């Protein structure tokens, strides 16, 4: 399948690479399909590119790379979502949405209070809000 993007031009993706977000991203509820694209080889960042809007892409990262003791109660979230997969396995993946201020990459932050949780079996994802979190939506990465 051909995907037109403003950052990468036209790229080929496989249908099974498409991740469906039934609720969309907060503020972008009409955007329901995304694909993960690598930023650069060996980069800790990826692009979470909208399939529907060529100009919409979020920078995401594995939060454990920057906060090894990051802890989220996945069992509770998975139960609330009705996902039946074994959360102790490799069926789930968390991503933190990253904010890189223009001209100030040293002020890059990650949203640890609202990670994107992906179900790698069903190719579904949801941005969850961790209630009563000790984390910040502006966790410094630099």
Regions found by a protein language model. Give the residues of each.
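Short active-site loop/helix that positions an aromatic residue
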Residues: 76-87
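Extended catalytic/binding region for NAD+/ADP-ribose chemistry, centered on the ART fold
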Residues: 69-76
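Long, compositionally biased stretches
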Residues: 1-67, 89-142
């Amino acid at each position: 399948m051909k995907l037109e993007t403003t950052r990468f031009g036209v790229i080929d993706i496989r249908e099974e690479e498409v991740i469906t977000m039934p609720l969309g991203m907060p503020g972008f509820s009409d955007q329901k399909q995304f694909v993960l694209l690598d930023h650069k080889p060996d980069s800790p960042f990826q692009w979470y590119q909208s399939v529907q809007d060529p100009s919409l892409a979020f920078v995401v990262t594995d939060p454990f790379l920057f906060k090894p003791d990051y802890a989220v109660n996945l069992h509770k979230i998975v139960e609330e979502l009705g996902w039946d997969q074994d959360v102790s396995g490799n069926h789930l993946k968390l991503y933190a949405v990253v904010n890189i201020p223009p001209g100030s990459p040293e002020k890059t932050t990650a949203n640890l209070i609202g990670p994107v949780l992906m179900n790698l079996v069903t190719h579904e994802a949801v941005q969850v809000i961790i209630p009563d979190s000790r984390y910040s939506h502006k966790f410094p990465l630099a």
